[in-house]
Amino acid sequence: MTIEFTDWPQDRAQRYRDAGYWIDQPLTEILHSRCQAQPQALAIICGERRFTYGELDTLSSILASRLAEQGLGQGDTALVQLPNVAEFYIVLFALLKAGIVPLNALFSHRRLELTAYAKQIVPKLLIASREHEVFRDDAYVQAFAEVGAAPAVTLLLGESDPAASLAHWIETPGSQPVAYAPTAADQVALFQLSGGSTGIPKLIPRTHNDYHYNARACADVCALNAHTRFLCAVPAAHNFLLSSPGALGVFHAGGCVVMAASPEPLSCFALVEQHEVNTVALVPSAVALWLQAAPAHRDKLQSLAYLQVGGAVFADSLARQVPGVLGCQLQQVFGMAEGLINYTRLDDSDEQIFTTQGRPVSPDDEIKIVDEQGVPVAPGEPGMLATRGPYTFCGYYKAPEQNASAFDAEGFYYSGDLVVLTPSGDLRVVGRIKDQINRGGEKVASEEIENLLVLHPEVTHAGLVAMPDEALGEKSCAFVVSRNPSLKAPALRRHLMELGIAEYKLPDRIRLIEAMPLTAVGKIDKKQLRHLVSVENTRTWLQTRLRQLIEDSEELDPEENLIFYGLDSLQVMKLAAELKARGIEVSFEELASTPTLASWWALVEARQKAA
C-alpha cells in the first residue's frame, strides 16, 4: 500500500533519471552512505549530547523496528511535532526506514492546525512533545478523536510512562528485531506544508527521488562538505532547514548539524563560538536581530563563513550590512516547499547577492514569467512565476480543485509570486498574487484569520492585508467592523488565541472601521484596505519625522503653522525629497504653501490615492 500522489509524466521522469537527478534510492541512503564512509563522524550536536552517524543510524533503526513491531509500515502516515532537538532527525530517519510517511508540523502550530492536519492524513502514529501546550495533558486525545483521527500509537518526548515515551522507544530495542523497509524511491517519502492562502496549509507529497535531488543540488550550490558545521536555529521542520540544503544536505555532505532552540542572537553566538559553526540559515527577521547584536560580540563569530537567508524577501539595506557586520558571505535563497529553489552563487557579484534572490539550482528547472493572460512578459517586467522540474511537485494531496487552479496544461506550477528576471538571469521577488502575508518566513492566510475574526459575536466583517516591515518583510493588519464601537484589539487577539491558532498568525495591527470597503461584485476591497494601511503608515512616518526635525514638538497641533514650531525651508525641502523617495510625488512648493500637518496629511493621502 502506498500514499496517493500526482506523479510526473513518464517522459519527464525518464529525462530526470537519464540526467542523473533521480537515482532511485530512498532518502535513507543519505544516512546509510555516511555510515559506510564515516560512522564515527559527528552528525548532530544538541546541547551537551553528541550523535555520530553510526549512533543516528542505530537509534533510528531501533525505533523503526519497534514501530514495525506494532504493525506500522508502508502506507501509514505519522503526524510529528517536535522542537529543535536531535530526536527530530532520529524520528525522521526511523519513519523513512519503516516506510511511514511523516507530516512534520511546526512547533508553533497549535490545536487548530494540528487537528486539521490529522483530519487530512488520518495518522496511525502521533509523535509530539509534552513541552507543547496541546500535549501537556491528555485532552488532545479527545480533540483528535473528534476529527476521526485517533492514532493507534502515540509517543511523547518528556513522557514518564515508558509505554508512551519517545525516549524509551528510541533507546530500548524490542524483544526481537522486526523487518522494515522504506517506500520505493518513486513513492511519497514525506509531506511538506504549503504556505496556503485559503486557511490550513495544503499538503505537498515529496518523493524520495525528488527530495533527495533537492537536497543534493542545494548542497552542491552551497559548497557543503564534511567540514560543514551548520547551525539549525530556524524550526527544523521548515523545508528551508530540512532540504534546501538544510540538514539533509549537510548529512549528504558528511557535515554536522548544531541544534539551537531559536535564532535568539546571544545564545546562537555562543553556539557558533563553542562549536566553530561555519554555516547558518536564517529568515530575514532573525538576521535583523543578529545585525543589531553582532557589533558587541563580533569575536564570537570568527568561524562563521556563510549565511543563507530565505523564507521571505530580504531588504537590500539589510543584505548590504551582512559582510561588514557579521563578517561572512551572504547567499540569498528563494524557494518553496512545492519545489523550485533559487540561490545566489558564492562567486556572484555583490549586486547580484544583495539585490536578487538568485537563480534555479538545477539545469532542468523550467520557469516562465507571464501576465494574467498567460503571455510571457518582457525581460525586466514583473509577472507571475510558473515552474516545473525534477523536484517540483505535480499536485497537492487530495486537492483536485486547488490543483486545477495551481497548474496549467503543460504541468507548470503557479506559485503566486510576482518576480522580475534581471539581466544577469537572476530572479527578484517583487510581490505576491495570493492573498497571503509572509511574516518573516511564516505564511499567514488572510481568509483563515478573517473567518476566525467574524466568529467573535461582536464582529460583522473582517479583512486582513499585509503591511511592509523592514525586519519581517511583512506584517498583518486586520480591519474589523464591529457592532460594539468600543471593542478593543486585545479582546480580538484573545478570541483568536482561544480558538487555538498559532501565535504568529495574530494580527500585528487591528483597526476598527465603520464600514468594510467592497468591490463592485461585493467582495472585500483589499486594494482599498492596503491604501488605508499606506496612508496610516505615511501619517505616522510624517509625524515622527517632524518630531525628529523640530525641537519643540512634544505636542504637534495638526492645524498650527509648522514654521511657528521652528521648521525652516531647508527642512521642508528635505521632507519633500524623503517623501519622493517613498514614492509620494509632492513638491517643496506644495508643502511650503500650506505648512500644517493636517494639510500635509491630506496632500499625501490624495497623492497616494491617485497613485
Curated annotation (Swiss-Prot):
Its EC number is 6.2.1.61. Residues 533-608 form the Carrier domain. The keyword Oxidoreductase does not apply. It holds the Pfam family PP-binding. The modification O-(pantetheine 4'-phosphoryl)serine is found at S569. It catalyses: salicylate + holo-[ACP] + ATP = salicyl-[ACP] + AMP + diphosphate. It is an enzyme of class 6 (ligase). Pathway: Siderophore biosynthesis; pseudomonine biosynthesis. One of its GO terms (biological process) is siderophore biosynthetic process. CDD domains: 23DHB-AMP_lg. Its cofactor is pantetheine 4'-phosphate. Keywords: Ligase, Phosphopantetheine, Phosphoprotein. GO terms for molecular function: 2,3-dihydroxybenzoate--[aryl-carrier protein] ligase. NCBIfam families: DHB_AMP_lig, PRK10946.1. PANTHER family: LONG-CHAIN-FATTY-ACID--COA LIGASE (PTHR43767), SURFACTIN SYNTHASE SUBUNIT 1 (PTHR43767:SF10). Involved in the biosynthesis of the siderophore pseudomonine. Specifically adenylates salicylate and loads it onto its peptidyl carrier domain, via a thioester linkage to the phosphopanthetheine moiety. Belongs to the ATP-dependent AMP-binding enzyme family. This is Pseudomonine synthase PmsE. It comes from Pseudomonas entomophila (strain L48).
